[in-house]
Amino acid sequence: MSELLDSFETEFAKFYTDSNLEETNLQKCLDHTHEFKSQLKKLKAHLNKHIQESKPEVYNKLSDKEKQKFKRKRELIIEKLSKSQRQWDHSVKKQIKYVSQQSNRFNKSTLNKLKEFDIDSVYVNKLPKETMENVNEAIGYHILRYSIDNMPLGNKNEAFQYLKDVYGITNKESTEFIEMGQIVHDLKKGDTESCLKWCSNEMESLSSNHTALSSLKFDLYTLSAMQIVKHGNPVELYYQITQNAPLDCFRHREKELMQNVVPLLTKSLIGQPIEDIDSKVNKELKECTSLFIKEYCAAKHIFFDSPLFLIVLSGLISFQFFIKYKTIRELAHVDWTTKDELPFDVKLPDFLTHFHPIFICPVLKEETTTENPPYSLACHHIISKKALDRLSKNGTITFKCPYCPVNTSMSSTKKVRFVML
């Protein structure tokens, strides 16, 4: 499986024309098409001028030499038009041919190999039918998390009905995400007011992360300033600098201000052109949107990454271990005996492992399970249920904590649930 993943990465990279995986051959087609359109516009302007000059009242006044020159000029325009069309046609056909060939190679070398084994034979414990409700809920969450900003959100009632009719998502599930989607919609349209309002409301809450929200507020101000610079309105820009500047967010950000905002504002005020302003605005918009979604999810206590996405990603990464185990099982004639524990270790990145809390009982030196959960004593030391039953003789006596002198009874213990902070 590791070889297949390496092959997958290598073949996929061939769809791009640079090592940073930013420009594809299809993007080159688009760039060449834009260039061709620009040339057509220039040639159209030349032709319009030529048509005006070819009117009888103008043309008849020309000398024979000027008429020859006029005719040659028309031929050059036609020749240049024909040459531009041929170059564009050749370039587009070449890129499309390359993409088509690479797509066929990609299917042959990677995608077809994914179908060479049966997934059900790799993982033998099937998903119980009673868990399908949880699966549907995870799918609904995934749709809400990643697609809400692309859905029609004219008003909340219409959005609720749309999500229910199309995806079967209840109003309870979609309530939190619709507000997020509406704010992201506004940001994409260049309106930062709703996001700033949400940010200010959250900063009044004692439980919010004020440092992160202050960063978001600063980035929103930067985005607004860039958008005004882009539209070239000096009066509005002056008002933005003097009246709308969030001074409380400027603390400890002098370096960012000097690097990102001040040069743009200065050039705009003195009338100098700003290179690549569109890409600068788009980059800042993406940063604001990403930071807002992250802080919104944290404030509403919802996952930033969809659990479904994390589970599928974990499955893809761990597939190589499952396939290796399948081979060993067939050769050694061993079987999988447990349903809640894998017979082998799976190495996953840290961000994929925080949903699986592990606690080793310090008394019995064994991992807690669903049948043997962790319990907190009166002194807040934690041991397993099996150790608790043994020390309390099944709840009939009080006992001293194994790690401190505090006495504990069964009634003063509480079951422990680990949460991600």
From Swiss-Prot:
Disrupted gene: phenotype observed: Causes a severe sporulation defect, specifically for meiotic nuclear division.
Protein name: E3 ubiquitin-protein ligase RMD5
GO MF annotations, alphabetized: ubiquitin protein ligase activity; zinc ion binding
CDD domains from the UniProt entry: dRING_Rmd5p-like
Top class in the EC scheme: transferase
EC nos: 2.3.2.27
Pathway annotation from the record: Protein modification; protein ubiquitination
Zinc finger residue extent: RING-Gid-type: 361-404
InterPro entries referenced in this protein's UniProt entry, alphabetically: CTLH/CRA (IPR024964), CTLH_C (IPR006595), Fyv10_fam (IPR045098), Rmd5_dRing (IPR037683), ZF_RING_GID (IPR044063), Znf_RING/FYVE/PHD (IPR013083)
Keywords, ordered alphabetically: Cytoplasm, Metal-binding, Transferase, Ubl conjugation pathway, Zinc, Zinc-finger
GO BP term (any one): proteasome-mediated ubiquitin-dependent protein catabolic process
Assembly: Identified in the GID/CTLH complex. In the absence of stress, the complex exists as an inactive anticipatory complex (GID(Ant)), composed of VID30/GID1, the E3 ubiquitin-ligase RMD5/GID2, VID28/GID5, GID8, and the RING-like subunit FYV10/GID9, awaiting a substrate receptor to form the active E3 ligase complex. When cells are shifted to glucose-containing medium, the substrate receptor VID24/GID4 is induced and becomes part of the complex, named GID(SR4).
Reaction catalysed by this enzyme: S-ubiquitinyl-[E2 ubiquitin-conjugating enzyme]-L-cysteine + [acceptor protein]-L-lysine = [E2 ubiquitin-conjugating enzyme]-L-cysteine + N(6)-ubiquitinyl-[acceptor protein]-L-lysine
An example Gene Ontology CC term for this record: cytoplasm
Cited function: E3 ubiquitin-protein ligase component of the GID E3 ligase complex recruiting N termini and catalyzing ubiquitination of proteins targeted for degradation. GID E3 is regulated through assembly with interchangeable N-degron-binding substrate receptors induced by distinct environmental perturbations. Required for the adaptation to the presence of glucose in the growth medium; mediates in association with the substrate receptor VID24/GID4 the degradation of enzymes involved in gluconeogenesis when cells are shifted to glucose-containing medium.
Span of the signal peptide: none
Family: Belongs to the RMD5/GID2 family.
Residues annotated as domain CTLH: 176-236
Transmembrane annotation, as ranges: none
Gene3D superfamilies: Zinc/RING finger domain, C3HC4 (zinc finger)
Organism of provenance: Saccharomyces cerevisiae (strain ATCC 204508 / S288c)
Superkingdom, natural source: Eukaryota
A Pfam family the protein falls into: CTLH
